[in-house]
Amino acid sequence: KENCCINEILEEILAEYYSIFKRENIIPDINICHEKVYRNLNKNSLIRIFENILSNMIKYSNGDFKVNLERSGTLIFANKAENLDTTTVQKIFDRYFTVENAKSATGVGLSIAKQLVELNDGTITAKYIDGNLVVKVKF
């Protein structure tokens, strides 16, 4: 583990995904706090967590999603997901679970993200709120 700046890593990953956003006609609403948020984490794990969550959001997005990083170290990823429901969201971290209309989904991305978050002493939760899938990560 090393002292990682969550802001910088998140910004790098979002920049790498820019062409995918453009291709998929996704306009992300990104809100990253100005204060640098540092945590003692495995950097490669953090990158993988962000990639897995973003890939999942792209698969299920209806053209939008939100990413927020708060000073507290809480990250919130949200996107419209009208094809989901509360029961489905409860299974979202189960290995091999997929939603029927997922584009090339294998069902391991969020399961791996959960394992990596927990290995880095964080928490990850998913809720279905007003037609949106909201994934919250805390470090």
Spell out what each predicted region is.
Residues D64-T74:
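Short beta-strand/loop element within the Bergerat-fold HATPase_c
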Residues L84-Y96:
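Short conserved segment of the HATPase_c
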Residues G109, A113:
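Short alpha-helical Gxxx[C/S/T] motif in the catalytic ATP-binding
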Residues M57-I58:
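Short helix-loop "hinge" at the ATP-lid/N-box region of the Bergerat-fold HATPase_c
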Residues K1-E2, Y38-N42:
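Conserved micro-motifs of the catalytic ATP-binding
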Residues I27-V37, S72:
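Conserved catalytic submotifs in the C-terminal HATPase_c
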